């Protein structure tokens, strides 16, 4: 991320944490107060439009949680384990067959 994106992101998080509505003017005010010089005003308006009407706190609390997933039947999970073991055995056999058999490329 660029400095401008980080500054706008942090400003939006500060506003959301204080319960203040996120707007381009408020983001720009926070960026100016932080003495960040490299941010063009367009970034503040882009972030304000992107976050308009969204609950930032809810977004942050739901980042790690996934939607409900359907549970796999117990029999299917048990059948998958032997298949994985067979795949591992095949991989090991391939490694053994790659050993040097005395034939060189330039012999």
Curated annotation (Swiss-Prot):
Residues 67-107 are annotated as: Disordered. GO terms for cellular component: cytosolic large ribosomal subunit. This is Large ribosomal subunit protein P1. Belongs to the eukaryotic ribosomal protein P1/P2 family. PANTHER family: 60S ACIDIC RIBOSOMAL PROTEIN P1 (PTHR45696), LARGE RIBOSOMAL SUBUNIT PROTEIN P1 (PTHR45696:SF10). P1 and P2 exist as dimers at the large ribosomal subunit. InterPro entries: P1/P2_N_sf, Ribosomal_P1/P2.
